[in-house]
């Protein structure tokens, strides 16, 4: 069975990458505010800020939350601006779009970590073979 992944599915940030981006965004102040009239101007401004900075915070006003959930607003902004939602905390959305392209940030399969016990067993087996030869 062949499964085709869309470009959007391929471009998921790993948990480790999101953690790093949240740390970088900690000191940032919101640069865009979304009000009750979320319009094309807001999307254009978010897009412009992402081109300039790469990582931004967007503040969602209470009036905007009367019509939509903050998570829906975050997803709509991310989709419209070809970005990824890093976090949604309170009324602040953190968005990320790399300036140099997505290739560097594509989700990769994690490498298999060898447990310490397995390493010790391997070393013991090697030592045992050497001892038998001598």
UniProtKB/Swiss-Prot annotation:
Pfam families, alphabetically? CRS1_YhbY (PF01985)
Domain (CRM): give its ranges: 11-108
**Keyword Cell inner membrane part of the UniProt annotation:** no
SMART domains, alphabetized = CRS1_YhbY
What domain of life is recorded for the organism? Archaea
Q: Which UniProt keywords apply?
A: RNA-binding
* Entries under InterPro entries matching the protein: RNA-binding_CRM, RNA-binding_domain, RNA-binding_YhbY, YhbY-like_sf
Q: Name one GO molecular function term.
A: RNA binding
Q: What is this protein called?
A: Probable RNA-binding protein MJ0652
Record the organism: Methanocaldococcus jannaschii (strain ATCC 43067 / DSM 2661 / JAL-1 / JCM 10045 / NBRC 100440) (Methanococcus jannaschii)
Q: What is the lineage of its organism?
A: Archaea, Methanobacteriati, Methanobacteriota, Methanomada group, Methanococci
């Amino acid at each position: 069975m062949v499964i085709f992944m869309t470009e959007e599915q391929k471009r998921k940030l790993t948990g480790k990458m999101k953690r790093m981006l949240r740390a970088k965004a900690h000191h940032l102040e919101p640069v865009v505010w979304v009000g009750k009239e979320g319009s094309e101007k807001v999307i254009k401004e978010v897009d412009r800020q992402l081109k300039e900075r790469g990582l931004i915070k967007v503040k969602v006003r209470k009036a905007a939350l009367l019509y939509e959930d903050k998570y829906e607003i975050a997803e709509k902004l991310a989709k419209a601006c070809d970005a990824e939602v890093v976090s949604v905390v309170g009324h602040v959305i953190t968005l990320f779009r790399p300036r140099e392209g997505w290739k560097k940030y594509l989700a990769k399969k994690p490498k298999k970590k060898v447990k310490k016990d397995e390493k010790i067993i391997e070393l013991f087996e090697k030592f045992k073979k050497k001892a038998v030869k001598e």
